């Protein structure tokens, strides 16, 4: 069994914000798997699905971004899952907009949701699907930038990026992060 976590903030006011791209990917992954977020546990919405041969719980923590790790840590402990069973999808300021990258470990890069997950699972050594949102304009607070909504004209690019992130997540679940990284990151570099 695997746990896929899309990071974001609950509430309609955060829909379509850069910081909620993890929720968007989780929603699309569940939709493609024919699953729905019908379970509520660990202060999170959960959808049970199958990705290839793997049973997967897709999670959207409802704790707000900075406390996402509480839900993730509780779920890992309850299901007795290891870090190799965890895939976290989140926005990333350090990647160009719409670029998708899969990595294992590394720092949180100032992302408070990732920082919280690291603290509550005891390590950064889990798979992360990073979805690039780019840097804010000069003199703009990064918090205001990530809480800003994607522009209407960005729909096509965002949809394509979400599909790439869903595919990266699926590969990480089915192949394991190490094997999946070669495919995902090669495609991401080729798209530049």
Curated annotation (Swiss-Prot):
Query: What are the site positions for Discriminates between blocked and unblocked aminoacyl-tRNA?
Result: 9
Quick one: a GO biological-process term for this protein?
protein quality control for misfolded or incompletely synthesized proteins
UniProt key word Electron transport: no
Q: What Enzyme Commission number(s) apply to this enzyme? A: 3.1.1.29
Entries under CDD domains matching the protein: PTH (cd00462)
Q: Which UniProt keywords apply?
A: Cytoplasm, Hydrolase, RNA-binding, tRNA-binding
Pull one GO CC term from this UniProt entry. Answer: cytoplasm
Compartments where found: Cytoplasm
Residues annotated to bind tRNA: 14, 64, 66, 112
Query: Is the keyword Lipid biosynthesis assigned to this protein?
Result: no
Instruction: Tell me which InterPro entries the record gives.
Output: Pept_tRNA_hydro, Pept_tRNA_hydro_CS, Pept_tRNA_hydro_sf
Recorded GO molecular functions are: peptidyl-tRNA hydrolase activity; tRNA binding
Recorded hits in Gene3D superfamilies, A to Z, give: Peptidyl-tRNA hydrolase (3.40.50.1470)
Please write the reaction equations for the catalytic activity of this protein.
an N-acyl-L-alpha-aminoacyl-tRNA + H2O = an N-acyl-L-amino acid + a tRNA + H(+)
Q: Which residues form a coiled coil?
A: none
Note the site residues: Stabilizes the basic form of H active site to accept a proton: 91
How this chain assembles, per its entry, is:
Monomer.
> Which family does the similarity line name?
Belongs to the PTH family.
HAMAP family, sorted: Pept_tRNA_hydro_bact
Role of this protein = Hydrolyzes ribosome-free peptidyl-tRNAs (with 1 or more amino acids incorporated), which drop off the ribosome during protein synthesis, or as a result of ribosome stalling. Catalyzes the release of premature peptidyl moieties from peptidyl-tRNA molecules trapped in stalled 50S ribosomal subunits, and thus maintains levels of free tRNAs and 50S ribosomes.
Protein name per the record: Peptidyl-tRNA hydrolase
């Amino acid at each position: 069994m695997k746990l896929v976590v899309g990071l974001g903030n609950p509430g309609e006011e955060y829909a379509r914000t850069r910081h909620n791209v993890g929720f968007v990917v989780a929603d699309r992954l569940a939709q493609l798997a024919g699953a729905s977020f019908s379970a509520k546990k660990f202060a999170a919405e959960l959808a049970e699905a199958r990705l290839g041969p793997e049973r997967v719980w897709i999670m959207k923590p409802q704790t707000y971004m900075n406390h996402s790790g509480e839900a993730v840590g509780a779920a890992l402990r309850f299901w007795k899952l290891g870090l190799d069973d965890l895939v976290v999808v989140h926005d990333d300021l350090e990647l160009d907009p719409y670029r998708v990258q899969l990595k294992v470990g590394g720092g949180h890069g100032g992302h408070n949701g990732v920082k919280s997950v690291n603290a509550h699972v005891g390590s950064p050594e889990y798979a992360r699907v990073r979805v690039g949102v780019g840097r804010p304009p000069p003199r703009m607070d990064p918090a205001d930038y990530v809480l800003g909504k994607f522009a209407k004209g960005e729909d096509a690019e965002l949809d394509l990026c979400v599909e790439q992130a869903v595919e990266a997540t699926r590969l990480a679940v089915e192949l394991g992060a190490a094997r999946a990284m070669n495919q995902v990151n090669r495609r991401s570099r080729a798209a530049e």
